[in-house]
């Protein structure tokens, strides 16, 4: 697979304007990225501009804290799909996971997967906030709930992707599930290290620089 197809070309800053999003979309077309990842209010715009290409539209749910209710996340997912999203990057409820409320976490992921109607679901586990044991649990629950990917980070917390986390996530989910590294990946070398450790998708706001 060519390098560009690993990349979710991402712009999730709250101050991003329509002009910024359109630039992101044009870059994704030019460099043939896997997807653009945008906030939910921009999904329709992305869909309209990408529907005749093979660049997917990715959006986020429960972002960035993961602390909204399951019902809210399900509704967000349904609206995103109606607006044209191909891929859903959801944030788990980190606090529920750390409280040992395993069924809550697992059921929530399952409900998002059901609401996604066979669209790709990536589960953001926010590795920087978790212990190693919690990372393993989050990955295991994501796999059991039928998600397609586990993802390291929102990029809005205290840290991003680390090679050792990617390695642990890959070992936990096995070879048939996707692993997405996101947060703090700024060079091609960093990207290649993530891929070597098991990442099958890269979330980055500097996608153009990574493939130039």
From Swiss-Prot:
This is Deoxyribose-phosphate aldolase. It holds the Pfam family DeoC. Its main location: cytoplasm. The active site is at 89 (proton donor/acceptor), 151 (schiff-base intermediate with acetaldehyde), 180 (proton donor/acceptor). Its EC number is 4.1.2.4. Keywords: Cytoplasm, Lyase, Schiff base. It comes from Clostridium botulinum (strain Okra / Type B1). It is an enzyme of class 4 (lyase).
């Amino acid at each position: 697979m060519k390098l560009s197809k690993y990349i979710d070309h991402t712009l999730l800053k709250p101050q991003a304007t329509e002009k910024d999003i359109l630039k992101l979309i044009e870059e994704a077309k030019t460099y043939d990225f896997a997807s653009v990842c945008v906030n939910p209010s921009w999904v329709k715009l992305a869909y309209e501009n990408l529907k005749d290409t093979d660049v997917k539209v990715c959006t986020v749910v429960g972002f960035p804290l993961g602390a909204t209710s399951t019902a809210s996340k399900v509704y967000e997912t349904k609206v995103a799909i109606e607006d044209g999203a191909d891929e859903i990057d959801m944030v788990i409820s980190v606090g529920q996971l750390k409280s040992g409320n395993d069924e809550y976490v697992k059921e929530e992921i399952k409900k998002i997967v059901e609401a996604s109607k066979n669209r790709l679901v990536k589960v953001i586990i926010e590795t920087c906030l978790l212990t190693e044991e919690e990372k393993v649990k989050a990955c295991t629950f994501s796999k059991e709930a039928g998600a397609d990917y586990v993802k390291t980070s929102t990029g809005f917390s205290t840290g991003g992707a680390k090679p050792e986390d990617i390695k642990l996530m890959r070992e936990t989910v096995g070879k048939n599930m996707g692993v997405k590294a996101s947060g703090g990946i700024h060079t091609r070398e960093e990207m290649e290290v993530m891929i070597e450790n098991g990442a099958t998708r890269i979330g980055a706001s500097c996608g153009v620089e990574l493939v130039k």
